[in-house]
Amino acid sequence: MIDLKFLRDNPDVVRASQITRGEDPALVDELISADESRREAIKAADDLRAEQKAFGKKIGQASPEDRPALLEGSNELKAKVKDAEAAQEAAEAKVNELQMKLSNVVSGAPAGGEDDFVVLETIGEPRTFDFEPKDHLELGESLGLIDMKRGTKVSGARFYYLTGDGAMLQLGMLMLAAQKAREAGFSMMIPPVLVRPEIMAGTGFLGDHSEEIYYLERDDMYLVGTSEVALAGYHKDEIIDLNEGPVKYAGWSSCFRREAGSYGKDTRGILRVHQFDKVEMFVYCKPEDAEDVHQQLLGMEKEMLAAIEVPYRVIDVAGGDLGASAARKFDTEAWVPTQDTYRELTSTSNCTTFQARRLQTRYRDENGKPQIAATLNGTLATTRWLVAILENNQQADGSVVVPEALRPFVGKDVLKPVKQAG
């Protein structure tokens, strides 16, 4: 959530952010009004409590004959205090409700929607094939890497098995990401994939896109779509030490997404699935360091994409395509030959203090005063990278050259077609 003081001091900035996102700017004025009512309710309750305290002293000093009347007045005042505290509680609940609806303030992102991104950099040239390239699923099946048929049989649409060298290719990619993260000072974690509602809400995922999340009603738990959620909750209600610099974690987990709003999109292969694996970077830092950290995360993503040897571009995502918690987001998109377009492989978001304020994660400034931390996240490797690896590294004979950085994990330089059983 955003800082109420910032909102009061900069209402036009927040209204403009809402407009950039394609969201309702009237929510800003509604929250400002609710905040004014809350502050009035707090003052009214404080004044009555002060009056009640003074009245109590008066009773203690009263004569026996005056005390009964004063006690009657005290009871009336007690009832007023109770009503005022109830009004304060209701006013605070209303402010919290509206704060939870308001997205983070966009910072530097271009205006517009999904198609209004700005290309910041293009790295590598799309390959020109002297044969008709196969898509990743055809390659995956012929090489014995992907089994969609049995995945669908066992679990339904958008499920799959990674088999043989396909499993090793993914494990190698994730291990390489973990190694690079450790070398860069990240602490590795394998976090829970089930989280409580307050953690999911704290990261900003229970807004307009909550239908994308798997919910276990019987247990009142959510399956995460990214380890960002559990890593953000790790320091909930804590004061962390940032004196030596940012606190950096890399979470390796399975991720789950309902893909409720994507009916008919990317139904072939493993680009858009219900379950996948990912190594996610997550950083806590001082707010003034957040923009530099954001560039560092993007740099690590670019280093990984260079290692898997695919052409890609970096885009600055438009405000209308940002998630609720992100003030700015950079995506990298790899070239997918059979689709003749770029597709997202990584995202890195600067969430400023939005998540940490909800989760009450703080640090102490140079004066020892607790302040809200900033949080950032970024993808370092994930299952859909296999799409780009297979398609961009395929050969005319149907084989796929394994990127050099992944060969120690896969144990092969080239993946060759195999005869499929069943």
Curated annotation (Swiss-Prot):
As its record notes, the protein acts as a catalyst of: tRNA(Ser) + L-serine + ATP = L-seryl-tRNA(Ser) + AMP + diphosphate + H(+); tRNA(Sec) + L-serine + ATP = L-seryl-tRNA(Sec) + AMP + diphosphate + H(+)
User: Which InterPro entries would you find in this protein's record?
Assistant: aa-tRNA-synt_IIb, aa-tRNA-synth_II, aa-tRNA-synth_II/BPL/LPL, Ser-tRNA-ligase_type_1, Ser-tRNA-synth_1_N, SerRS_1_N_sf, SerRS_core, tRNA-bd_arm
| Highest taxon of source | Bacteria
**What is recorded about the domains?**
Consists of two distinct domains, a catalytic core and a N-terminal extension that is involved in tRNA binding.
Q: Which family does it belong to?
A: Belongs to the class-II aminoacyl-tRNA synthetase family. Type-1 seryl-tRNA synthetase subfamily.
* BP GO annotations: selenocysteine biosynthetic process; seryl-tRNA aminoacylation
- Give the main location: cytoplasm
Q: Which NCBIfam families match?
A: serS (TIGR00414)
What name has this protein been given in UniProt? Serine--tRNA ligase
Q: Which SUPFAM superfamilies match?
A: Class II aaRS and biotin synthetases (SSF55681), tRNA-binding arm (SSF46589)
Alphabetical UniProt keywords = Aminoacyl-tRNA synthetase, ATP-binding, Cytoplasm, Ligase, Nucleotide-binding, Protein biosynthesis
Family annotation (HAMAP family): Ser_tRNA_synth_type1 (MF_00176)
Coiled coil region boundaries: none
Listed binding positions for L-serine are 226-228, 280, 379
Q: Name one GO molecular function term.
A: ATP binding
- This protein's encoding gene: serS
Pathway noted in the entry: Aminoacyl-tRNA biosynthesis; selenocysteinyl-tRNA(Sec) biosynthesis; L-seryl-tRNA(Sec) from L-serine and tRNA(Sec): step 1/1
Subunit comment: Homodimer. The tRNA molecule binds across the dimer.
A GO cellular component annotation here is: cytoplasm
Q: Name one Pfam family in it.
A: tRNA-synt_2b
Q: What is the protein's known function?
A: Catalyzes the attachment of serine to tRNA(Ser). Is also able to aminoacylate tRNA(Sec) with serine, to form the misacylated tRNA L-seryl-tRNA(Sec), which will be further converted into selenocysteinyl-tRNA(Sec).
The residues the record assigns to binding ATP are 257-259, 273, 344-347
Question: Which cellular compartments is it found in?
Answer: Cytoplasm
Record bears the keyword Translocase: no
Report the EC code(s) recorded for this entry: 6.1.1.11
